[in-house]
Amino acid sequence: MVKQVTPVYDWDPETGVSTCIIMRNGKTHIGIAKCRPEDRDMMGEKTGCTIAEMRAELDYLRSIRDDEIKPKLEAYKTLYYSINQSNRFNPDSYETHMLLHKIEQTAADLDLVKSMIKNSQEDLHTYMKQKAETWKKIRKHREEDKTN
């Protein structure tokens, strides 16, 4: 079971770097967001920490995929291949059916995590795009105010 832990944030207004640290299942996942030089006029703690947290969550999902689900699926497939090569292999046995079920279930888990990673990446991209559009409008209004 995943124990929810409050993320730890760090914001450095001098450098424009935000960091988010998430500890889950004994592993540390870090997300970093660095403000681009051309956006320093719009730099903010909330935006930086939000982006850093989204990146830390992505790191967590990738670790689940790469460190847990993929090795488990590979082990199940290797086991099935090994028993399939045996002279005593019985495709109708309870154990064979359970192993095939575990392979299917783990493959479905892998597909789910891949989908979650894709959705999280899209959410991050959308968030950053919306922020860029907002900043563009604010800059435009500031320019208009200066000329008036």
Give a label for each model feature:
Residues 61-105, 109-112, 116:
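Intrinsically disordered, low-complexity charged/polar segments
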Residues 5-7:
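A generic, well-ordered mixed alpha/beta core segment in the N-terminal half of proteins
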Residues 93-148:
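C-terminal charged interaction modules
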